[in-house]
């Protein structure tokens, strides 16, 4: 399929359980275009260097601000002189999240989730460890907006905003071939992490549901994700994701007849995780709790510095 689209997939290894990210390379209107970049580390550099030596890269499109997509963009821009394209909301997130003004609140936020002190410190340290893997930041030259058209390889793609996994996440859609570069919005085997990170949209799970239903209306046949393999029938996978999260919401709701902390709810949903994985689990648990709160299914109150949620 990628050959037919005249697109090259560039797979970058990641040092996590989710062990890779797919970036993409194709000819654009004025030269070569790269979609996403990987972390800023030696593994990524060694993969991109021979590629950019052979291709005149004019544009770098960033689908969202998470480190595995955004991290190497600044260095890649410096090496190629390419323009960087990104949504304005995720440009702001990506260039402020790993700065002292944000990082100083990390441990306090984890404390407020009811997480014990040592683990709260470890979670904060894990987050801070990504600073070197996202800097230098790119200079964003153009802001991506809903409905924009991008020439990539043989075809033109429409930018579709799909907030949920991040507030400014985009997907790219070609109607002619019923193809969607789904980025991290729809993945074939795992559910994208939908987390509330104590800032931005305070009900990201609601945004994710809305974005899934938005794509569902397109009835996409071919889905090219940023993690995992190409698959067919987007709508089948969308139904599976909606059902999965509804099951999670039901599970949380059944366990909050008495006041429950974010940490306790997290332990209901997730087991045997590393510190890195636990950080995402906390964010995803909080997103589910905030969904229930926003939909008037539970109350929320703070006692002795810790947030509690209780079903209504």
Regions from the language model: what does each represent?
Residues 2-55, 171-183:
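Conserved beta-strand hairpin/beta-sheet module of binuclear metal-dependent hydrolase folds
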Residues 26, 36, 64, 87, ...:
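Divalent metal-coordination and catalytic microenvironments
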Residues 49-150:
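Active-site HxH/HxHxD metal-binding segment of metal-dependent hydrolases
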Residues 81-86, 181-182, 277:
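Short hydrophobic/aromatic-enriched beta-strand-loop microsegments
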Residues 251-312:
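C-terminal regulatory/interaction regions
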